[in-house]
Amino acid sequence: MNSNAVRWPNSLWAAVTPSGPDCPELTGAQQADVVIIGGGFTGLSTALHLREASVDVAIVEAAEPGWGASGRNNGQVIPTLSRPDPDDIIARHGAAGERFVAMLRDSAADLFDVVRRYNIAAEQEQAGWVQPVHSPGRIRIAERRVQQWSKFGAPVELLSRDQTKDMLGSDAWYGGFWNRTGGHVNPLALARGLARTVVGLGARIYARSPALSFERRGDRWVVKTEKGEISGRSLVVATNAYSGEFAKSLVPEIATEVMPVLSWQMATQPLSDNVRKTIIPGRQAMSDTHGELYFARYDARNRLVTGGAVLGPGDKTGRLKARVTERLQRLWPQIGEVSFDYVWNGYVGMTADFLPRMHRLGPNAYGWTGCNGRAVALTIPLGRELARAVQGVPESELALPFSEPVQYMAHGLLRKLAPWMLVLYRRRDAQELVKGDRFELLRWAEYFLASRRSR
């Protein structure tokens, strides 16, 4: 892959974000103490924490830092998981689960701390994250989350319907869960800022250098690319959602453990000040409890950055614009005519039980999967934990225990069928207003069964 082959999506983030550091291709034979495959948030965070400990580290990136999921997402900084709550995590992992919950609790604060300490210009706004509930039955989700996260000292609050209306500027929701430490960033600016930071600290990033294979030679791992190779005493594979694109032949057990789900993002024209002040006036990040998720946040230019899902062939962009326009006008009639300046997509890495996983891939070799839509906050402390593992910290002290990869059965078929789950989600969303309790029970039964299958 050469520099001309790196094509960025037509995204808002690619349009407004300054270029990252100049990263050469990997050529010849190189060495480092630690080699990381993947230049997204996790790989960059791992490199950052290793360089803080003066470890010689090099990243091998297939395209450019932030090209994959890290630079394409909505940029919401969410210090929770998508489904499992603290009690679920502790029931699964015991004492390690308590450490993991503490890591999650602090994950958003950790991200904003890194941004401040290294003066990364990521358009960051720590105004909090709110999860409004879309049906009366779903208020139980917010109540449960507030109760469980409060036990661990998280700054969370249960919002009434009136409080939610005041916070979001819409009466479409029935209450909500609010975490004050959340917020949002320009994710590509964060990725490029992290890349610039780690290079400044002495790390090397080899771009446009897809890893073709790795093997154990003596006491070192050797990663081969088209034009060169690099060896290290330790190896970290941090490809996650794009494992199937760039690392399927490298670590098939990881590539088939994570399900890449296509996520569409959209950015409106900048809203006028008068309208902006009536729609999410406090500029919180918002994503609700719909199966077909409703989510939105502002960028630094007052564009409303949202998205949706679309099925089938044909003009997907046109149909998506029409569907999301109708949604925005229904939620916020005051928005008036809606025009989208940018529409793009990228993959989210999903595991069957909605939990992230760390793996040992061999002596001094590590990998992970499963951002499950929470990568922006999660990957910063996760990179720290991978760096600690590389440096020999015992597993009993890590925030996330190691586990064996658990593949999706019939992964290729499921990948084709997964988008059509949207039909089921839409049907449930429409029926929940009448039969909320029934569908709430079904949702958690599904989670329980997925957890049992992945053990």
Residue ranges and their predicted role:
Residues 52-72:
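Glycine-rich FAD pyrophosphate-binding loop
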Residues 314-430:
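C-terminal catalytic lobe of FAD-dependent flavoproteins
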Residues 72-103:
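Glycine-rich active-site loop/strand segments that organize a redox cofactor
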Residues 140, 147-150, 172-233:
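Helical element adjacent to the flavin cofactor pocket in flavoenzyme catalytic cores
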Residues 77, 117-125, 211-213, 228-363, ...:
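Active-site substrate-recognition segment that forms the wall
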Residues 32-59:
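N-terminal Rossmann-like FAD-binding beta1-loop-alpha1 element of flavoenzymes
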Residues 1-34, 52:
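Extreme N-terminal leader/targeting segments of oxidoreductases
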Residues 2-16, 83-89, 113-193:
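Flavin (FAD/FMN) cofactor-binding and adjacent substrate-gating region
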